[in-house]
Each structure stands twice: as structure tokens, then as C-alpha cells.
């Protein structure tokens, strides 16, 4: 996938790709981490993950299946609506409360700690949401917080 543009660029002596934009977040890790990250690391490319907040699921807005019933985003988050998905959100909410941040801010700060990630991509529909996104650029998570999020993420992956 990424190797074709790399090899063609080298063969044709044209500029090589410098970044990719994968689907990557606490709920969607394996495809990027297992397949793409090794190529990105070898090619010294940047990573700009999209859906960093999993279509809003990682903001703490959805804490139970009942919270998702009338959501216009249900089709985008339906894979996450299960006990393991809600447990991950509970862990995000818990860490956010401990450090005085919003869950979405914590989720994006976690992404920033990942190898090769240059900057996560997340959308906002209000000024308040923009403030949370900006706060993620300076929020530093402790190793314990990262481990707790990794564990919750691993439990979610195992539930699929």
C-alpha cells in the first residue's frame, strides 16, 4: 500500500510521500500498529491519524447504549457500543477527572504519545470543542495513565 508510492517515487526520481493519514485511535489500533507503522518508521514518514476521537465516542458523550440510541453518529460508532467500548470510555473519563481535563483531550493526548504520530486530526462543531482539542497539544499523560489507556484499549481489541 505505502510501499508502492515509495518505490515508484524512487524509480521515477520524484518526491516521496512524507505522511499518511490512517484511521487510528484508542479503539482502532491494530491495522496501523501491525501493518503500517513499521513501513512508516522505515520511511521516516509522519502520521496524521483521522477519527482521533472515534466519531465522538471517545469524548465521554456516550457512556451507555441508551446514550447512543438517537445519535446521528450511531452508524459510525456501532462497532464500539459494547461493554469493552464503554469500559474504555469509563477509563478515559476517570483519567480526565484525575487530571482536570476532558475525555476527548485525554484521548488525543494519548495519540500524541504514540510512535510516529505527528498530529491527530479531530473535528469540532463548537468553540468549546476547539478549546478541548487545543488543550490536547500541551497535556502530558503520565506513564501510568498511558498504561491504563493501553490496557483498556487492549481489552476492547480482545472483545472484537
Model-derived features with residue positions:
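Conserved histidine-centered catalytic loops in small-molecule metabolism enzymes
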Residues: 158-160
Amino acid at each position: 500500500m505505502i510501499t508502492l508510492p515509495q518505490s515508484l517515487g524512487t524509480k521515477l526520481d520524484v518526491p516521496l510521500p512524507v505522511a499518511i493519514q490512517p484511521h487510528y485511535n484508542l479503539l482502532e489500533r491494530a491495522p496501523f500498529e501491525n501493518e503500517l507503522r513499521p513501513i512508516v518508521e522505515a520511511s521516516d514518514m509522519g502520521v496524521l491519524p483521522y477519527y482521533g476521537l472515534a466519531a465522538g465516542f471517545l469524548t465521554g458523550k456516550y457512556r451507555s447504549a441508551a446514550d447512543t440510541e438517537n445519535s446521528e453518529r450511531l452508524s459510525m460508532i456501532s462497532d464500539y457500543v459494547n461493554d469493552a467500548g464503554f469500559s474504555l470510555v469509563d477509563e478515559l473519563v476517570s483519567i480526565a477527572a484525575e487530571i482536570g481535563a476532558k475525555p476527548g483531550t485525554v484521548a488525543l493526548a494519548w495519540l500524541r504519545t504514540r510512535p510516529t504520530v505527528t498530529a491527530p486530526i479531530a473535528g469540532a462543531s463548537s468553540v468549546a470543542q476547539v478549546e478541548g482539542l487545543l488543550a490536547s497539544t500541551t497535556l502530558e499523560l503520565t506513564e501510568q495513565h498511558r498504561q491504563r489507556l493501553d490496557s483498556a484499549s487492549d481489552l476492547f481489541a480482545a472483545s472484537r
